[in-house]
Amino acid sequence: MKKILVLGGTGFVGAHVCEKLVREGWAVTLPTRRRSNANALQHLPGLTVLECDVHDEAALAQVVAGQDAVVNLVAILHGNQAAFERTHVALPRKIAKACLAHGVKQLVHVSALGTDALQPQTLPSMYLRSKGEGEAVLIQAASGAVAGSGERGGFDLSILRPSVIFGAQDKFLNVFAKLQKIFPVLPLAGANAQFQPVWVQDVATAVVRCLAGASQAASPRTIELVGPEVFTLKQLVQLSGQLAGLGGGFGRPVFGLPDWAARLQAKLMGLAPGEPVMSTDNLDSMKVPNVATGKFPGLDSLGITASALQPIAQGYLQGR
């Protein structure tokens, strides 16, 4: 039985990835800061939960040792420069170093659509820049070296760049529907930003297919994960309200804000307690269309037909 380490496996996407890996016969190791974070997954046969801080380099090396493959899903949407650097750049560097040191043969890294590993500093947000820098670190490592580590060897690398991900437990369409239950009218920052939403199950399947060698592209390979339809943010907010049956089935009125008001709204939301719905960095990220560029292969290169959003979202938003 092949062994795999799934980093970030307790999250929305990670849970689906773990379930699919177990079904495919992998022995899954799932590190988490608190065992309780993995309560929903501990019933899976062949899955081992370990309490571990993966940002601790020594602890990470211990859990990487003996694995055949690693999946990295660790990511944040909000934070300051230091937080993005720690999560999206420093952690991939530590993962790469550990993979090289312990002879791990495969790494699947889930990044983000809209980033650029070649020129990350040209990107408009901390999120996208850090994602691109993290990709660059891994691409260098896949060829056999991590700067300053002295380790050599290389590994098979798949970088997956999904658009915004939807599914029954998402913090995307569900949030928009919830807001429309509270507010009769929604002023919206970034209303014209473009997205090509991809179903969480398609993303999880893509991870498993990469591990199975389904892609014919040479390593390191980058694959864009998108759905079949492009929406503006305003359309997605309106659709979530409609599918939830709000406003008589028409959703609440949604109107886009001018740039100055959008930045003010995003700034105020970013200061609110708890995880913000939006921040100024999110708004900056939306300057880059979150749609397929056509420069890289997509889901079809892995034998996956992209799932349409509306029939799936209706199933979990209807009557909420």
Residue ranges and their predicted role:
Residues 3-26:
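N-terminal Rossmann NAD(P)H-binding glycine-rich loop of SDR-like oxidoreductase domains
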Residues 176-190:
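A short C-terminal helix-loop "cap" of Rossmann-like NAD(P)-dependent dehydrogenase/epimerase domains
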Residues 158-175:
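Flexible, glycine-rich beta-alpha linker
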Residues 171-172, 190-213, 221-227, 235:
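Substrate-positioning beta->alpha
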Residues 36-37, 43-101, 112-122:
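NAD(P)H-binding glycine-rich loop region in Rossmannoid oxidoreductase-like domains
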Residues 210-279, 293-320:
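Mid/C-terminal beta-alpha module of Rossmann-like enzyme folds, strongest
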Residues 26-34:
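Conserved glycine-rich Rossmann-like NAD(P)H-binding loop of the short-chain dehydrogenase/reductase
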